[in-house]
Amino acid sequence: MNQATQDFIRQHQDDDVRQLAFLGSKYPEVDMPFALDQIRGRKMARVKLPRWASLEGIIYPPHISMEQCSSESTALYKAELAARLLDLPASSSGIEMKAENEIEFVDLTGGFGVDFSYIAARLGVKSMYVERQAHLCEAAKENFERLGLKNAIVKNGDGIEVLHSFLPKKDDAASTDDSLGITYDQPLSLLKTKLGLKLIFIDPARRDDAGNKVVSLKDCTPDVTVLQEEMLSKADYVIIKLSPMLDWHRAISELSHVREVHIISVNNECKELLLVLSARNLGDMEASSADGEVKHAGNLRIYCVNDAQSFVCDELDMESSPVKIAPSTLEEMQYLYEPNASLMKAGCFGVLSDRYDARMLSKNSHLFVSQAPIEAFPGRSFRIIAISSFNKKELKRHLSGITKANIATRNFPLSVAELRKRLKLKDGGETYIFATTLSDES
């Protein structure tokens, strides 16, 4: 990047990139496409990656990579997850390891490097970032230096071929095939780890060659269903990052040794699905329920996270906790609850009902009610001020004086738009209306 481009970026960092795009002929010495990427990227980073945005000299990728990269909050979550898996104390982070230490963490699909940077900094172990696109590797080298990562190795190459280069955890052989078509920044011997990796992170692409989104785990690139056994033979843990649109039940049926499912939401919008795999004997991997009781060590555990809220249950909980259905009269019910997006995705409604002593309005409503207020319910809570049938006169009486409301439908024959039109209400205000079908189909 020449000085003219640097000056242009600094002088126009708050300007509209759509207007700046017309100034190319006025600034022939400026690398305009690159400059616009930097200005646009830093604006996005102020919201998505505030720590990165606060640093001078961070290089941002083209717009699509910025849209697809993790946010700071989700990257921090993954970093803490990795630290827990590796049994690191809560206070340890960013420990610079000696050069002779073997690689313990590898990100096989580095991308913009957000997840890698936070995980590597938290673990403090020698870590490798692998990415096929050279321009992302160049940006990663610059950015990791500015972020103070002293333990990062950047590799421009194919993640699968790099995976093949690592020895299995129990293989003490001293030699492997050096005839790989990859140029490494460090001697290939660094890959000949005898003890095996501690952690592999992989984020397979969820689009096909035509750019269309795929819904099956096997259609992602690389295909982790094919790679899983090799990854598990070479690392204690594997974290797979997936689209929240994927069916996690189907995904775990296509994989072996899935130990944890993490459904991560930000501002009640489901952002990521993480699967933790391990072939280790995980009898010591215990998680506490809401009341502090350790349950079903070693069983598949589901983490439903929305910002600071976290709800943990496991497969046995889900199998042994039928949903409690509310009586259709609802006369004594005073409070209504809407589970957050992660819980909706997880579908652990029986556990939710049992743990908080709440009743679901009907099997398919996914709305809960209770007589007494429930503190710290993982979702939105409302005080019920009126319950009405869909009778026109009854609705008119309850809606008297209300001109606008926030409307949601659950298991209801009309859409929100249709219901709003029928009720003649504007959007917004402090009133919330939930339209649903009760257990008696009323």
Predicted regions and their residues:
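SAM-dependent transferase fold signal centered on methyltransferase-like domains
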Residues: M1-S442
